[in-house]
Amino acid sequence: MAKNRFLLIIAAVFVVLPAALSLITFYTDWLFFRETGYTQVFTTALAAKVGAGLASGLFMFAFAMVNLYFANRASLPHTPRGVFFEGGNVYRLQRDEMVQMVKPLSILAALVLSLLAGRWGALQWQNLLLFTNGVTVGTSDPIMGKDLGFYLFSLPLLEHVKGFVAFTVLVTGIMVGAVYFFRGGIILSDRGADVDGAVRRHLAILLGIFSLTLATGFYLDAVRLLLAGGNSFHGAGYVDVNARLPLYRILTLATPLAGAVVAFGLWKGAWRLTLIPPIIVAAVYGIGIVGYPAMLQKFKVAPNELALETPYIANSIRFTRLGYDLDKIKTVPFDVELNLSAADIAKNDATIRNIRLWDHGPLLKTYSQLQQIRTYYKFFDVDNDRYLVNGQYTQVMLSPRELSYNDLPSRNWINERLIFTHGNGLAVGPVSRISREGLPEFFIKDIPAVSLADIRVTRPEIYYGELSNDYVIVGTKVPEFSYPTATGNINTTYGGKGGVALDSMLRKALFAARFKTEKILLSSDITDQSRILYYRTVGERVKTVAPFIRFDGDPYLVVADNGTLKWIIDGYTHSSRLPYSKPLRGGINYMRNSVKAVVDAYDGTLDFYISDPDDVMIKVYARIFPGLFKPLSAMSADLRGHIRYPHQFLQVQAAMFATYHMTDPKVFYNRENLWEIPVLGEAPMEPYYTVMKLPGEAREEYILLLPFTPSKRDNLAAWLTARCDGENYGKLLAYTFPRDRLIYGPKQIDARINQDSHISQQLTLWSQRGSQVIRGSMLVIPIEQSLLYVQPLFLAAADKAGLPELRRVIVAYGDEVVMEESLELALQRIFGGKRAPVAGVAAAPEDGKASTGDLAREAMSIFERATNLQRQGDWAGYGEELRKLQQVLKQLAR
């Protein structure tokens, strides 16, 4: 009795309890999908999981049980095997007793394996939906002639089915063999194995079926040759097509024949006949798939590699460019001219005004110290965007002020779940403006939000964000904390439609079980009007609804025209089955930025938009989930004005384009024009957003830009740009520099900065005074047909609490390198003239030259600063001001 009670407890702990928790998670997830309005996605995925799981489990169970039925019913002449029990004693059981033991054990094994098979099959629900809803692409692979839709939508499931059937037959054969062994149908002795005829016939049938799975495997191996990697290119090469592919086709046909011969020999008890076919198949595989291809490669292909591999290299180039959307990149020559003038600088004032001087790292630290307000707020990330500010197209940097539960002064359940429920507002500022103290200027700051430009925030609360990683309960008897003031805390009550109502004891109990706390059930502060908000992290929220989409790791916040805050996060369709396409680390070789997801920061509302309607994979997903995706035209106009080409996707494309811009197989093979992404320090440059006027365009626009250098060289080879605005969104342009001239690259400019005696002296002096010098990102800014190089310098105290201040800006143009207190002064030193301040308050004179009066006033101002520095004993600063004065006097002398 006690033993049975113990077994019941074990079963409850390891079976019933996990099953109950799974059901609770399942039901509360259903409530989440109902809250967000995507129940159709939930039910479609559920139906696919149940269907695939049942089909797999039932197939395994039926196949195993049919075979076990015959194995247990077979009439066998031999005596059953002995069974060893504890103590080392051997008990010889009678046939009926043995059958009574073997039969339930074999059924139990079949049941357990079927459950595992069902779980394994359920994991293939996405492959099942792609298979049943796949479409033709209209492009075929160059070797097999199969439409690419076969690889993208059918092959993943076929590979799984083949592996699953082979596994089912194999484990069933093992179970059947074990049953026959214990029932005495297989006798092992020193003279060998004595196998009963009924056993041989049964195993022969299983062997024949298994040979069919092997043949299917060889067929799929032939198909997968197009996905294999090579030395100089990806996909099937000369040896694969002319040696391995024919052999795989032969093996596909020969393996079932060999299996039939082996099965016949086993059926008849002709043991020698069972050995010859496997040996032949193994020999053909070893010689035809391994040996012969190696010899062909060494003696024929290697001496004539370019001539023989050219068509296959062309295939790899074509399909890799297709896989990463590189075939849509338009290449444009960019002939650099060093004739930029002050008038050109003035004409491109919007470009100059939007050069990003504030780096993400220093700005994040500065925002944290200036705008964090309280320790429990945190700026997690800084993002780039653009707004129309006071009538000017302006690039901004912004960072949400989120709530950090780890930094709450008193961490308890009521504080973390009922009171401190949300972040508040954001900090927004221009990318290039700096105060006299070297600090950023703000368009939006403080709590409550203060707008210093025409960007208004009416709903600053952030319930859903990048740090909102656990549940909260709103609408309780406890007032929510909103923000602190000098006179006390301001409270609020959630008025959104997000969350699931806790309107019954059952729901409270279910969520208490899900989140492993009895407080949800027992708290008197929770009423029937309370709502529980979960899946609050932006990435987790969108991934829960659309797990088949790979989402970007960097969502960004947008202030909508009505003052609400919206998160935008990019989503990617992907596959690892595109023939001839070179894969990324992790296997992906097809990728499209086809989804823009929008999450309301206040109520968690989710919307998914198709940003690349030409992507065949998003077309299939839209067929599978007809209510999930909307056309991009359905997005509100103000949000459409803030979509941007994703930084991470351009990084992927650039990494591939560095090699696959070479479309000539000969050039590709010889790596004659291989590019690299420039490296500064230990890290490669990352794409950066800016506002500029592209060559041949009439106005400035928001773009994403990344330069290239030739392989193992430091000069510039090209720059890749992605357009982000309006009808031009998603268009990619590669501007290539002349190969017969030296165009300075970022690393060369960096070296020239280090070699400049004045700059290096100033950096050394700052370091000796205990300041930490932080060199910002080197930006390459195309203007007209020229290039500017801009790098900000930040100073901070050497301790961790040091506030980074933007104190100098280095600008390089042609052979000149200057360092000044502002971008405006640096440009003025190089190009002369008195241009408009970076803030764009006043316009430059039409002729691009400063008046005599302006220069005289500037000289007087510099002289006064120099005098003050002399009194303070700052001789380095004094010398720098004298250099500036010299430049101004030279301009006066002209």
UniProtKB/Swiss-Prot annotation:
Q: Keyword set for this entry? A: Cell membrane, Membrane, Transmembrane, Transmembrane helix
Please state where this protein is localized. Cell membrane
Where is it found, in Gene Ontology cellular component terms?
plasma membrane
Membrane topology term: Multi-pass membrane protein
- Record-linked Pfam families: UPF0182
| Entries under InterPro entries matching the protein | UPF0182
Q: What is its main location?
A: membrane
Q: Which domain of life is it from?
A: Bacteria
Q: Where are the transmembrane segments?
A: 6-26, 50-70, 98-118, 162-182, 203-223, 250-270, 275-295
Please report which protein family the annotation says this sequence is part of: Belongs to the UPF0182 family.
What the entry lists under PANTHER family is as follows:
UPF0182 PROTEIN SLL1060 (PTHR39344:SF1)
The identity of this protein, by name, is: UPF0182 protein GSU2333
Query: From what organism does this protein derive?
Result: Geobacter sulfurreducens (strain ATCC 51573 / DSM 12127 / PCA)
